[in-house]
């Protein structure tokens, strides 16, 4: 009986967590849960004057293209320097 109850609790938690639960970095240290419709994490380079740039970390539905950009679809994957 305890096993059945535990199984039902686990299934309920898993089912409740299936919706929009992708987590991405929103800065170098902060994270966020992505809103509905945004199913990718991204880190992309935004240009400044004189050839310098900084990185923007966010959730997205369509990633930017670029040599330094990361586009991926697993939790907290947009901090690394490789795509996933």
Curated annotation (Swiss-Prot):
Alphabetized, the UniProt keywords read: Acetylcholine receptor inhibiting toxin, Disulfide bond, Metal-binding, Neurotoxin, Postsynaptic neurotoxin, Secreted, Signal, Toxin, Zinc
> What tissues is it present in?
Expressed by the venom gland.
Annotated InterPro entries: Snake_toxin-like_sf
Q: Which cysteines are joined by disulfide bonds?
A: 24-41, 34-59, 63-71, 72-77
Detail which positions bind Zn(2+). Answer: 50
Q: Name one GO cellular component term.
A: extracellular region
UniProt entry tagged with the keyword Signal: yes
Task: Extract the signal peptide range.
Answer: 1-21
Q: Where in the cell is it found?
A: Secreted
A GO molecular function term, named singly, is: toxin activity
This protein's record includes keyword Transit peptide:
no
Residues under site feature: Contributes to dimerization? 58, 61, 64
What is the role of the protein in this entry? Postsynaptic neurotoxin that produces potent, and completely reversible, postsynaptic neuromuscular blockade, as well as broad spectrum inhibition of human muscle and neuronal nicotinic acetylcholine receptors (nAChRs). Inhibition is potent or moderate, depending on the receptor (alpha-1-beta-1-delta-epsilon/CHRNA1-CHRNB1-CHRND-CHRNE (IC(50)=2.56 uM), alpha-4-beta-2/CHRNA4-CHRNB2 (IC(50)=1.8 uM), alpha-7/CHRNA7 (IC(50)=7 uM), and alpha-3-beta-2/CHRNA3-CHRNB2 (IC(50)=12.6 uM)). Acts as a competitive antagonist of ACh.
**Similarity field:** Belongs to the three-finger toxin family. Short-chain subfamily.
Q: Subunit structure, per the record?
A: Homodimer; non-covalently linked. Is able to form a tetramer of dimers in the presence of 2 zinc ions.
Q: Which additional comment does the entry carry?
A: Negative results: weakly inhibits human alpha-4-beta-4/CHRNA4-CHRNB4 and has no activity on human alpha-9-alpha-10/CHRNA9-CHRNA10 and human alpha-3-beta-4/CHRNA3-CHRNB4 nAChRs.
**Could you tell me what this protein is called?**
Three-finger toxin 3b
Q: Which organism is it from?
A: Micrurus fulvius (Eastern coral snake)
């Amino acid at each position: 009986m305890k096993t059945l109850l535990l199984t039902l609790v686990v299934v309920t938690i898993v089912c409740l967590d299936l919706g929009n639960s992708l987590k991405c970095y929103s800065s170098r240290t902060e994270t966020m849960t992505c809103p509905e419709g945004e199913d990718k994490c991204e880190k992309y380079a935004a240009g400044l004057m004189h050839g310098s740039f900084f990185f923007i970390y966010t959730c997205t539905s369509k990633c930017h293209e670029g040599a330094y950009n990361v586009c991926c679809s697993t939790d907290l994957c947009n901090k690394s320097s490789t795509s996933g």
